[in-house]
Amino acid sequence: MTRSITICVLTLLSSLVFPTASFTALPENPSRPRVRTYYIAADDVMWNYAPVGRNLTGTPGPENESGVSSTIYRKAVYHEYTDGNFTSLKPRTAEWEHLGILGPLIRAEVGDIIKVFFKNNTKFFCSMHPHGLAYAKESEGALYTDNASPEAKKGDAVPPGQTYTYTWTVPERAGPASGDSSSILWVYHSHFVEPRDMNTGLLGPILISAKGSTKPDGTPKDVEREFIVAFAVFDETESWYFESNAMNRKKYTQGLRFSDPAFRQRYLLYSLNGLIEGNLPAMTMKKGERVRWYLFANSNDDDVHTPHWHGQTVVFNNMRTDMVHLEPMMMVQADMEPDNVGTWLFHCHVNDHIEGGMQALFTVYP
């Protein structure tokens, strides 16, 4: 499998040249679309799926059977930087700490232009590919045979250490439809070798609001609190760093062959935003606040989920419910007005996923 992927990738790359992309800023002009600029890099990290080292939900069942060392993996994640020098990380505010492994939040309104200055700090080729937005071939960020010119393919596979600039636009069809909430979720991710890229950790959220519907800080006017949660099964056997991670985990797979289902099971992490067993940072809100939840699933075979909130209900697709359904890479939003004070469980209702630790807590204050 690895050999066939390598041959395919080398064939597609053979005709490409990868100079550093450049961008000339548009002058200030009220008649022009608003340009939202982001500086994002793909960085290597050591990621801990359970940094506290234990199950914080208190639900009955065994703690992670392999111990905390089995939840530490080398991964790649998207980080936001303050400028194009890519030397100073932009701090993540407390309200967005729950994003966990997800890349920085990209926001825009219908009619805007999004400019992403991207740098690849990893050891493998990668990219940034957005769902839902409009883009030319130069900014698709997805490597496949599409008869585009070599010049138009440069952003599909950014080499280690190199930079590239993506330009995405937000037409009406990228924003909320009639009957939608005022803001909707899209996802961006690396699309070089998509299964490997995403299982390595390269994915993040995009929120698009209807034109004129946001506050000065970019949040929707009709919402007081937002949460973004990825119901993500990470298959570490599909990571670019599987070999190096496996070297540190041999004792957990002794006597198992790679082809054994039990071997792969040891490398499946059932996470919410890359964190398991209640290790997701606190999600808090006040009674009566207007809360919007944005949910999506990762792209593995196991990523069929039924997110469920205890103690509250939400409005999803104009229906009152306390549980929604997700398929691989499906994105949804649900609105909540919490009325039940306390700390509540939020989890996937698929039994294997509950047992794997796909659970978190949220708290409603008076």
PLM feature spans:
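Bacterial N-terminal signal peptides that target proteins for export
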Residues: 1-9
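Bacterial N-terminal signal peptides
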Residues: 8-19
